[in-house]
C-alpha cells in the first residue's frame, strides 16, 4: 500500500521527485527490496512495505546510522533532539565535537544537516531545513 511517508531529511541527489515514477516499475511480488543508494530514503518510505525483507544502505555511514537509530531507538532519538536549540554556537559545537554513542552520532548528524545550508553540515542556517 502506498502511504507516501516523508523522510526526516532532505538529501542532495535524493529520489523524492522520482518515487512516484519508480514505484510502478517495481514488481509487486518481490521477496526483498534493497536500497543500495538510500540517501534520504524517500523511495523506501513511499510504501508501507515493499517486501518481507527491506534493506537500506548508503556509502555514507552517518546516514545508515541515523536511519538505524530512528528505527530501533526512536524514543531515545526524539528525547535527544527535543531540546536542541538552533544556535550558531551549538552548530559549531556539533561540527567540532566528538560523540561516542551511535545515538549521539545520529543526533549530531541530524542537527548538522537540518541546520546547514543545502543540508551539507558545513554552514549554519538559523532555521531548520527539515523536520522529524
PLM regions: where:
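Class I S-adenosyl-L-methionine-dependent methyltransferase module
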Residues: 49-132
Amino acid at each position: 500500500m502506498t502511504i507516501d511517508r516523508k523522510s526526516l531529511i532532505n538529501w542532495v541527489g535524493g529520489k523524492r521527485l522520482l518515487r512516484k515514477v519508480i514505484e510502478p516499475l517495481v514488481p509487486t511480488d518481490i521477496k526483498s527490496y534493497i536500497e543500495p543508494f538510500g540517501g534520504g530514503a524517500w523511495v523506501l518510505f513511499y510504501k508501507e512495505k515493499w517486501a518481507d525483507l527491506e534493506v537500506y544502505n548508503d556509502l555514507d555511514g552517518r546516514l545508515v546510522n541515523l536511519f538505524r537509530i530512528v528505527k530501533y531507538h526512536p524514543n531515545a532519538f526524539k528525547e535527544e533532539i527535543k531540546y536542541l536549540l538552533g544556535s550558531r554556537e551549538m552548530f559549531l559545537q556539533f561540527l567540532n565535537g566528538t560523540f561516542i554513542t551511535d545515538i549521539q552520532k545520529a543526533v549530531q548528524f541530524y542537527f548538522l544537516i537540518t541546520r546547514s545550508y543545502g543540508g551539507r553540515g558545513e554552514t549554519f542556517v538559523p532555521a531548520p531545513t527539515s523536520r522529524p
